[in-house]
UniProtKB/Swiss-Prot annotation:
This is Pectate lyase. InterPro entries: Pec_lyase, Pectin_lyas_fold, Pectin_lyase_fold/virulence, PEL. The lineage of its organism: Bacteria, Pseudomonadati, Pseudomonadota, Gammaproteobacteria, Pseudomonadales. GO terms for cellular component: extracellular region. It comes from Pseudomonas viridiflava. One of its GO terms (molecular function) is metal ion binding. Binds 1 Ca(2+) ion per subunit. The active site is at R264. Ca(2+) binds at D169, D208, D212. Keywords: Calcium, Lyase, Metal-binding, Secreted, Signal. One of its GO terms (biological process) is pectin catabolic process. Residues 1-29 form the signal peptide. Its main location: secreted.
Length: 380
């Protein structure tokens, strides 16, 4: 047998390395140019974001200034792709002292036809918050640390004992059509609620929501996303008085993790909301984020809960999963609570069925799937 020369071996090694680099780059390009394939975001013409962006409308950003510039740049009709590398501190190390200051410096408005994707496993937004108010937006493979309002407001009429309330969610989808949130992690992160102390006899809450959908937003899918360590998580529909939301707020949340989430996972008004293959884990006696309820059944809500897995210590029965907030219908099919079938007595006449194709896992397969795949850094 003739042995290859050193030159030939080196050429072969170089070719292998080059092919691996090309494959890696190709895989990353696929992440940035993917379009929505599941849930409500596939309807109304689909959700494509900046998947067809021209090369000169693709930005890689590593700091707040670059991110803001990419969001504000004038681009062509095919939109933009913004690739986030590493941790971005939107405050640039200058702490917010007032709510107004946080609004002025921390707000990140996402234009229509935009894809935002983390390209490193540690891609993260801190000290900032996203607003999606324009159509056709995709956010993937990113950690968002829930914003911390420096000036919570006391409301003596909130509940029987009053409460502290704050502004700003990690992501607010407001009035926009066709939004896909995929493999994103939302967390209180470095500032958990036990660090905030109390005032007026109540915990001083510096967080608002993690991800809210409101004011007529429509055709939204949240997939393989992780929500961790948060109190009031997802609000779909902001007010009982917004009757114009009826027929809108079509949202799918699937194969997502809710870990130590106290409430609003999600709380719904008006919307046709499909919740399937989600894994909820927590405890009614958790020292910081005690479980209160998962699905809030609000005015004219039409929730279809399907094959979700709830592992919540200290609770039993559907009334602790589906909380009554003024709604009248709720359909669950095939979900489990602590390993046994969830049985609900709500009227299941929600009046709609999903118009898109999907193949849900059985509830006993959900935990393994979600823990392996949900959240930032886990796109296959």
């Amino acid at each position: 047998m003739v042995k290859p020369s050193l030159f030939s071996a080196n050429k072969l090694a170089s070719a292998v390395v080059a092919s691996l680099l090309f494959a890696s780059a190709g895989a990353q390009a696929d992440i940035a140019t993917d379009v929505a394939t599941t849930g409500w975001a596939t309807q109304n013409g689909g959700t494509k974001g900046g998947s067809k962006a021209a090369a000169n409308n693709i930005y890689t950003v590593k700091n707040a200034a670059e991110l803001k510039a990419a969001l504000k740049a004038s681009v062509g009709t095919n939109g933009r792709i913004i690739k986030i590398s590493g941790v971005i501190d939107v405050s640039e190390g200058n702490a917010y002292t007032k709510t107004a200051d946080m609004k002025a410096r921390g707000r990140l408005d996402i234009p229509g036809k935009t894809t935002i994707v983390g390209i490193t496993n540690n891609a993260e937004i801190r000290e900032g918050f996203f607003y999606a108010k324009e159509n056709d937006v995709i956010i993937r493979n990113l950690t968002i640390e829930n914003p911390w309002d420096p000036e919570p407001i006391w409301d003596a009429n909130d509940g029987s004992a009053g409460n502290w309330n704050s502004e700003y969610d990690g992501l607010t989808i407001e009035g926009a059509n066709n939004v896909w949130v995929d493999h994103v992690t939302f967390t209180d992160g470095r500032r958990t609620d036990d660090q905030n102390g109390t005032a007026n006899g109540r915990p001083k809450q510096h967080h608002d929501g993690a991800l809210d959908v409101k004011n007529g937003a429509n055709y939204v899918t949240i997939s393989y996303t992780a929500f961790k360590s948060h109190e009031k998580n997802n609000l779909i529909g902001s007010s009982d008085s917004r009757t114009t939301d009826d027929g809108k707020l079509k949202v799918t949340i699937h194969n997502s993790l809710f870990e130590n989430i106290s409430a609003r996972a999600p709380r719904v008004r008006f919307g046709q909301v499909h919740l399937y293959n989600n894994y909820h884990v927590g405890s009614a006696s958790h020292s910081v984020y005690p479980f209160s309820y998962a699905h809030g059944i609000g005015k004219s809500s039409k929730i279809f809960s399907e094959k979700n897995a709830f592992e919540i210590s200290g609770i039993s029965g559907c009334t602790k999963i589906a909380g009554d907030y003024g709604g009248s219908v709720y359909r669950d099919s095939g979900s489990t609570l602590n390993g046994t079938a969830l049985t609900c007595t709500w009227s299941s006449s929600i009046g709609w069925t999903p118009p898109y194709s999907y193949t849900p896992l059985n509830a006993d397969k959900v935990k393994a799937d979600v823990t392996a795949k949900a959240g930032a850094g886990k796109i296959l």
